[in-house]
Regions:
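Helix-turn-helix
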Residues: 4, 8-41, 45, 49
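Hydrophobic alpha-helical connector segments
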Residues: 45, 59-88, 144-147
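Short, basic, alpha-helical segments at the C-terminal edge of helix-turn-helix-like DNA-binding modules
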Residues: 48-56
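Short secondary-structure transition hinges
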Residues: 81-123, 131-135
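Hydrophobic/aromatic-rich alpha-helical bundle segments in the mid-to-C-terminal region
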Residues: 90-94, 108, 112, 131-176, ...
Length: 189
């Protein structure tokens, strides 16, 4: 059902019915309600699944980077990569933002749990960078959450804002410099 929901999201955003989802998934409506109490619960599961997939992808992609600081930079700036893609990526980004805000009103704790893998990914690299003497954050337990929220805020803005070619690369650099400074890291001269 999650794969079927993903296909419908790419074609319709969240403007699909549970009946359309069941038809796409090839399951009965009763089967849907056996797993999910509502469409919103399905969307939370889709977000959680997408977050897990993204974190796995980023972890694999960053495996060859030289140190925790390079991996942390990659993880933070990669959150904006989809914004510089084709029309389908832009539509997906807008869906993520609008759906996330709508779900946040009624499912704040569940949404935080679905997004926790990204915070955990950042926390692991912050701690590894601290152990390597590369960072000195004021609060290594909480700071990754604040960084995730900042990256999300930038993503939300640029999902809807027009931007010039190359602008996102500048934004990624500025986001990284801000986060590095906030974590007690030093900027290279």
């Amino acid at each position: 059902m999650l794969a079927a929901a993903g296909r419908l999201i790419h074609s319709k955003g969240d403007e699909f019915t549970t009946q359309e989802l069941c038809a796409e998934a090839g399951v009965a409506l009763q089967t849907f309600y056996r797993y999910f109490a509502s469409k919103d619960e399905l969307l939370l599961a889709v977000i959680g699944d997408a977050m897990n997939d993204a974190c796995e992808y980023w972890t694999e992609s960053a495996a060859e980077l030289p140190d925790a600081l390079a991996r942390l930079r990659y993880f933070i700036t990669s959150t904006l990569a989809r914004l510089d893609g084709d029309g389908r990526d832009a539509a997906t980004a807008r869906f993520i933002v609008s759906t996330r805000w709508r779900l946040h009103r009624n499912y704040a704790k569940e949404l935080a749990e679905a997004e926790k893998p990204f915070v955990d990914l950042l926390r692991a690299e912050v701690n590894a960078a601290v152990d390597a003497g590369l960072l000195n954050p004021p609060d290594p337990e909480w700071d990754p959450w604040f960084i995730a929220e900042l990256a999300r805020s930038v993503f939300h803005y640029y999902a809807f804002a027009e931007h010039a070619e190359g602008e996102l690369e500048v934004v990624k650099e500025k986001l990284w410099r801000f986060c590095l400074t906030a974590l007690g890291g030093s900027l290279e001269p």
